[in-house]
């Protein structure tokens, strides 16, 4: 199952990657934003969607729905809310996130999307990348599963950096998910 808050390009990429893989099934997409494009992308790809509020996430409503699905893995792909401890504790080592930087750099609260890419640019970094990590109770501090770097010293805008990072995300995130689920 996938959790997302926004456009959902990673979600769609993951769904399409696993269509022809009988060992892995994307069972649902949970979204906290009722106007997010990810909802349309999931529906277009015949994946059920559950929309919930921040209050439902904080209470046991989302936990109960997730538990009922018995997921082997919960994948955060552009999900912008912090998960409650009750959800993390119910699924130890079964929740992963992708972050658009090489953690521990540019992680933590408020560091997502363009904010990360702008910080990379502002600090004249020569490289950035992606990190896939387990989720714990602190933003972007879970155990690192996978990292991949890319040179960005030729980039002059945060948008150029974002484009390069998205290529990495789309290439490697589904493969990392597959490795975790088929070990």
Tell where the protein language model's regions lie, with residue ranges.
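One-carbon transfer enzymes
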Residues: 1-183
């Amino acid at each position: 199952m996938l959790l997302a808050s926004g456009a959902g390009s990673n979600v769609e990429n993951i769904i399409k990657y696993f269509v022809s893989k009988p060992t892995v099934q994307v069972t649902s997409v949970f979204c906290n934003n009722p106007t997010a494009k990810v909802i349309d992308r999931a529906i277009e790809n015949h994946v059920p969607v559950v929309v919930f509020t921040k209050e439902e996430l904080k209470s046991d409503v989302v936990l109960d729905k997730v538990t009922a699905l018995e997921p082997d893995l919960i994948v955060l792909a552009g999900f912008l809310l912090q998960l409650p401890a009750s959800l993390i504790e119910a699924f130890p080592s079964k929740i992963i996130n992708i972050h658009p930087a090489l953690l521990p750099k540019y992680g933590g609260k408020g560091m997502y999307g363009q904010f990360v890419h702008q910080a990379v640019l502002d600090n004249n970094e020569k490289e950035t990348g992606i990190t896939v990590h387990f989720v714990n109770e602190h933003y972007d501090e879970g155990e690192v599963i996978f990292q991949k770097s890319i040179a960005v010293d030729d980039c002059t805008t945060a948008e150029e950096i974002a484009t390069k990072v998205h290529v990495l995300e789309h290439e490697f995130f589904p493969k990392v998910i597959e490795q975790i689920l088929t070990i």
